[in-house]
Regions:
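A short glycine-rich, Lys/Arg-flanked "PGG" loop and its adjoining helix->strand segment in the class I
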Residues: 145-160
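A C-terminal cap/extension of S-adenosyl-L-methionine-dependent methyltransferases
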Residues: 1-3, 215-297
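Conserved N-terminal segment of class I S-adenosyl-L-methionine
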Residues: 1-135, 144-149, 213-214, 238-239, ...
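A short hydrophobic/small-residue beta-strand
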Residues: 94, 161-162
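Short catalytic micro-motifs in class I SAM-dependent methyltransferases
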Residues: 135-142, 164
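Short, glycine-/aromatic-enriched active-site segment of Class I SAM-dependent methyltransferases
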Residues: 163-191, 195-202, 214-218, 223-225
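Short glycine/proline- and charge-enriched loop/turn segments
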Residues: 37-47, 176-185, 225-231
């Protein structure tokens, strides 16, 4: 094990990064105060919220591809239910699981949401779902292998798992180093290289169907915020804090000059970041990736 960033160590065998020491469950709960989730139904400032929803819902045709009419779909860590709402609009039976009521505020009423700190305690029957989505959640969990094993159990034979994570072996991660926005310490307990994630899925009874390296919602912003973090001239992750829709009491305490500089670098940086996102997609090294896997049998 070698140190890579504050509180983060990297396994020299598998390449996975993890917090050391691991926080206790009580400490983990403290990483997610109510304001982390934003106001009910929203997480970002209004114009960003509309953009996030627009881009996110463009993925729904991908998520619903090849599903039979009325198929049961589970979103692990469903949050505000953006994915579930769009899938419900397409006639699917949607389910979600979250760690707290605060996390799921604003979720679509058509979704059956279960509140459980661990997926294994949510009480789903074996083979119940045709598809399970775990979108930028696996890295937050203290037992990722156990969660993947539980997903395998509750999927029907031939059922599909779609999992998205930051790619710890990506060009963006290597260039950014400890300044990488997608590290998100200490909330991300694990950092997965793509090849290690695929190996984990294969070892738990899945076959890899496809991998995808392009994310307009995640990857360009990661370039901009990571570059600002590297410069150390502005608050760490300050741009994200500026765009986040927190309560008034919890708003980022930036003065006018700092806010203007953050907005300036957002406007200037996005075009180059989009180009870099295209490049990392071409070389199959997306800053965030999603993998489609199928349960054998």
């Amino acid at each position: 094990m070698v140190g890579l960033a504050p509180k983060l160590i990297d396994c020299t065998d598998c390449g996975v990064g993890r917090l050391d020491p691991m926080p206790t469950p009580e400490e983990v709960r403290g990483f997610y105060p109510d304001e982390y989730y934003g106001e009910p139904g929203t997480k970002f400032q209004p114009f960003v919220e509309h953009l996030v929803r627009f881009v996110g819902e463009r993925h729904i045709s991908f998520l619903s591809r090849s599903l039979s009419p009325g198929a049961r779909v589970l979103d692990v860590g469903c949050g505000r239910g953006v994915i579930l709402r769009a899938l419900a609009d397409r006639g699917f039976e949607v389910h979600g699981v979250e760690i707290s009521v605060a996390a799921s505020r604003g979720a679509d009423p058509r979704a059956e949401i279960r509140i459980s700190p661990r997926l294994i305690d949510a009480g789903y029957e074996s083979g119940f779902f045709e598809e399970v989505v775990i979108w930028h959640v696996l890295e937050h969990l203290d037992d990722p292998k156990g969660v993947v094993q539980e997903i395998h159990r509750i999927l029907s034979p031939g059922g599909r798992l779609i999992v998205a994570v930051p790619n710890y072996s990506s060009v963006q991660a290597r260039w950014s180093g400890p300044a990488w926005f997608h590290l998100d310490l200490p909330r991300h307990l694990y950092q997965f290289p793509l090849q290690t994630l695929k190996r984990l899925l294969q070892e738990t009874g899945f076959e890899i169907v496809s991998e995808h390296h392009f994310s307009l919602r995640q990857n360009p912003f990661g370039w901009v915020q990571s570059a600002l973090n590297r410069s150390q001239s502005l608050p760490r992750n300050g741009l994200y804090s500026l765009l986040h829709h927190r309560s008034r009491e919890a708003s980022a305490p930036f003065d006018l000059w700092t806010r203007l500089k953050l907005w300036f670098w957002l406007v200037v940086g996005v075009p180059l970041a989009v180009v870099l996102t295209g490049f990392e997609t071409l070389v199959r090294s997306g800053a965030t990736v999603h993998v489609v896997a199928r349960k054998k049998g």
